[in-house]
């Protein structure tokens, strides 16, 4: 009986610890009557909680069920908010390079809180591209934009395309929701 009681107490402590650890990896950003937006501490992803249903949407595949199924660059792509595809204008080779946030060795990342959301500032120094991403709560929606005037290509590279939230995940298979580009 004592062993069973000890195991139950340990399981309760582990559950409390894992919830506390999960909360430490997110920064609360904005909230309205329906949604709550939080940012990952590495500034490369966010989560949106639907307060009415309890469902959480994530901008990345941070679900433990995916652990080990992807490796290397694919894992970093799956957990990055965006991938910037660039080409070298000086070399003129026409080849496209993927600049993945979590693969960027010289990533400069910061954020500013704004009304109803956050502006993420990224500087991908390896490719010489800096850009801002706005994530805002508007009523029952999440608006994600990369304003043209906040893109700066300061080296030999130019942006070909931006893959925004390539692996946006719903909280469960039966959760309603839409994604528009």
Predicted features along the sequence, with ranges:
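Sec-dependent N-terminal signal peptides of Gram-positive bacterial secreted proteins and lipoproteins
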Residues: 4-22
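N-terminal accessory beta-strand-rich subdomains and adjacent acidic, glycine-rich linkers
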Residues: 23-181
């Amino acid at each position: 009986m004592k062993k069973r009681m000890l195991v139950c107490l340990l399981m309760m402590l582990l559950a409390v610890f894992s919830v506390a650890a999960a909360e430490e990896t997110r920064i609360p950003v904005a909230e309205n009557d329906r949604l709550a937006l939080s940012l990952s501490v590495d500034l490369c992803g966010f989560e949106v909680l639907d307060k009415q249903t309890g469902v959480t949407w994530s901008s990345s595949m941070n679900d433990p069920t995916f652990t080990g199924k992807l490796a290397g660059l694919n894992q970093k792509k799956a957990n990055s908010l965006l991938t910037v595809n660039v080409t070298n204008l000086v070399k003129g080779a026409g080849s496209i390079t993927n600049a993945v946030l979590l693969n960027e060795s010289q990533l400069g990342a910061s954020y500013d809180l704004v009304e109803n959301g956050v502006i993420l500032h990224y500087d991908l120094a390896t490719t010489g591209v800096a850009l801002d991403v706005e994530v805002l709560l508007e009523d029952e929606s999440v608006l994600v934009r990369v304003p043209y005037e906040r893109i700066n290509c300061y080296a030999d590279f130019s942006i070909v395309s931006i893959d925004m939230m390539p692996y946006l995940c719903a909280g469960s298979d039966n959760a309603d929701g839409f994604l528009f580009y």
